[in-house]
């Protein structure tokens, strides 16, 4: 932004030559700089904090003794994982006190490439939620599947100078960093040359490998699951982003590792969080509750949720209640439950008692619609011929993204093709970006499905169609339903569609209200377990969406076939 037109107004209001816009009285203000509570009037004007003084004002707000916090900041989130559009996501999190997020849109980038990134910038431009993008560093995520786009350093350079781009998204290709891969280092340099942050992703790295990763000026990691990992990264000067998502919930394990000495290198993030969890448990406000319940000082916790994130990602005018900073703030009842009562963004009331009170424009862009592009399929598309009855099977683990590499004697029909049964279900991945006709077919154990099929276009990271079923006819109906809806999640049985959740934005997001999406999702979960008999130990849709990610051991399936993560090579289903 250009500050000069604003400066006259700010100085005149602060000096008392002009009325301020708002004075907040009777608030207990959390001062994240001095780690104290300030009880004084707070003057606001031009969307900025002006100072702690009484003034002539156009409006006043009685905080009634509540605590006033800087607006909360999510240090790393994939908005697409909420299953709703950016505007609907903003409606969810603003009501919980989050006023800024660092969003890594690598899901939509894998489908739509630069057009998807431009959509995310355009769709968030006029929202009261401040959305900064971390440009995805790994599109495609691996060379073992067909994604919708390839983004090299030259492509990312077209957007890196945008003022709302915070830097480079999580560098998942840590082997490439350690090996000095030229394309990887080009992307890192692209951000560093502009003084922007490089986000990290280094699960399991330690010792010299971790030091090498940090030497590449990668600033953060949100993959810590132990206090030891957390402390090692902080000792190397990295920020640790403590994650509490829908699947990965690390806060309870990591919060005891926060100390007065290292707290300033901690940030809160959600990574992937579904709307039902935000509606029920909250967003970054939930991190505050967990942190305090595990002994973290409340003011320290607020600092982690605000100033630390702002400093980590270069948001120099946010993260604190101080003169000249953007007047994002939250009123909460206390510093234990953190019940959010009012939320202000740039000095304007945007949410009250859990409800957003301003219009949030949704952004329509044809470039991210109609993204299901498949070659016509027939009833032979999912046939799986096997030379013998012995087959490699993907074994599901309850409550885990890991799979087992199994060998099973499997049933076959008269033509030698696999027929689901004996607890075994057919799995297929259909390429949906360029109509290549690629269909990978495999077998899974532990899913429990009987009498139908489940399919989704949310399939990490390339987001092809993944479908599981115990008969080819219902699998075909499910894929055709996703083609009809432009993507989403569907359940089929007996040749008909039982339920669908359309996700027409890139096959990843709905533009319907989050409450509606959450209700439909809950109904579909019930159908999946009750009607299709999917195991209660399995989350039906998230499990499917990660069976296609060929970086998490042991066996995974892509549109190119069965992949053994242990050897990083394709293998055959038949043994």
From Swiss-Prot:
Q: Which cofactors, by name?
A: Mn(2+)
Q: Name one GO biological process term.
A: adenine catabolic process
What is the top EC class of this enzyme, as a single word? Answer: hydrolase
Q: Does the keyword Manganese apply?
A: yes
User: What catalytic activity is recorded?
Assistant: adenine + H2O + H(+) = hypoxanthine + NH4(+)
| Keywords, comma-separated and alphabetical | Hydrolase, Manganese
The molecular function terms of the Gene Ontology recorded here are: adenine deaminase activity
Q: Which CDD domains does the protein's record reference? A: AdeC
Task: Keyword check for Manganese, yes or no.
Answer: yes
InterPro entries in alphabetical order: Adenine_deam, Adenine_deam_C, Amidohydro-rel, Metal-dep_hydrolase_composite, Metal_Hydrolase
Query: Which EC numbers does the record give?
Result: 3.5.4.2
What family does this belong to? Belongs to the metallo-dependent hydrolases superfamily. Adenine deaminase family.
| The protein's name in its UniProt record | Adenine deaminase
């Amino acid at each position: 932004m250009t500050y000069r037109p604003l400066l006259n107004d700010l100085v005149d209001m602060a000096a008392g030559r002009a009325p301020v816009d708002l004075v907040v009285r009777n608030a207990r203000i959390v001062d994240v700089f001095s780690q104290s509570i300030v009880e004084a009037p707070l003057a606001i004007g031009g969307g900025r904090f002006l100072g702690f003084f009484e003034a002539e004002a156009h409006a006043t707000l009685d905080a009634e003794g509540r605590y006033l916090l800087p607006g909360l900041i999510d240090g790393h989130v994939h908005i697409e994982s909420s299953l709703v559009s950016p505007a609907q996501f903003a409606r969810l999190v603003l009501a919980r006190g989050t006023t800024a997020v660092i969003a890594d849109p690598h899901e939509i980038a894998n489908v739509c490439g630069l057009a998807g990134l431009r959509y995310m910038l355009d769709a968030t431009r006029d929202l009261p939620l401040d959305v900064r993008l971390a440009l995805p560093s790994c599109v495609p995520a691996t060379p073992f599947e067909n994604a919708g786009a390839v983004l090299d350093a030259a492509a990312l350079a077209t957007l890196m100078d945008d003022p709302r781009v915070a830097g480079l998204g999580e560098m998942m290709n840590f082997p490439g960093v350690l090996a000095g891969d030229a394309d990887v280092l080009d992307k890192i340099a692209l951000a560093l040359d502009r003084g922007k942050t490089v986000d990290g992703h280094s699960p399991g790295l330690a010792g010299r490998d971790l030091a090498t990763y940090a030497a590449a000026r990668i600033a953060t990691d949100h993959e810590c699951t132990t206090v030891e990992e957390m402390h090692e990264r902080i000792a190397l000067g990295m920020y640790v982003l403590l994650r509490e998502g829908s699947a990965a919930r690390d806060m309870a394990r990591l919060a005891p590792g926060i100390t007065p000495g290292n707290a300033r290198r901690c940030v809160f993030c959600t990574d992937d969080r579904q709307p039902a969890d935000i509606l029920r448990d909250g967003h970054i406000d939930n991190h505050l509750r967990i942190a305090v319940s595990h002994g973290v000082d409340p003011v320290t916790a607020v600092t982690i949720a605000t100033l630390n994130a702002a400093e980590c990602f270069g948001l120099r005018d946010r993260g604190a209640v101080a003169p000249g900073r953007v007047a994002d703030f939250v009123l909460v009842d206390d510093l234990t439950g953190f019940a959010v009562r009012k939320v202000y963004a740039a000095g304007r009331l945007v949410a009250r008692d859990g409800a957003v009170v301003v219009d949030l424009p949704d952004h329509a862009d044809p470039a991210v619609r109609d993204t299901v592009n498949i070659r016509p399929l027939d009833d032979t598309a999912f046939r799986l011929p096997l030379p013998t009855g012995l087959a490699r099977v993907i074994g599901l683990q309850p409550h885990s993204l890991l799979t087992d590499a199994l060998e099973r004697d499997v049933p076959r029909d008269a033509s030698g093709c696999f027929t689901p049964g004996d607890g075994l279900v057919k799995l297929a991945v259909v390429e949906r970006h360029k109509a290549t006709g690629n269909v990978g077919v495999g077998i899974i154990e532990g899913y429990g499905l009987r009498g139908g099929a489940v399919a989704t276009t949310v399939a990490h990271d390339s987001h092809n169609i993944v479908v599981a079923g115990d008969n080819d006819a219902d699998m075909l109906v499910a894929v055709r339903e996703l083609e009809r809806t432009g993507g989403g999640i569907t359940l089929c049985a007996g040749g008909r569609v039982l339920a669908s959740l359309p996700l027409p934005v890139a096959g990843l997001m709905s533009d319907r209200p989050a409450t509606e999406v959450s209700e439909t999702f809950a109904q579909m979960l019930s159908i999946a377990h009750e009607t299709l008999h999917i195991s209660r130990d399995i989350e039906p849709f998230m499990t499917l969406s990660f069976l296609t990610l060929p970086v998490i051991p042991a066996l995974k399936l892509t549109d190119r076939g069965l992949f053994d993560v242990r050897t990083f090579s394709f293998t055959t289903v038949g043994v």
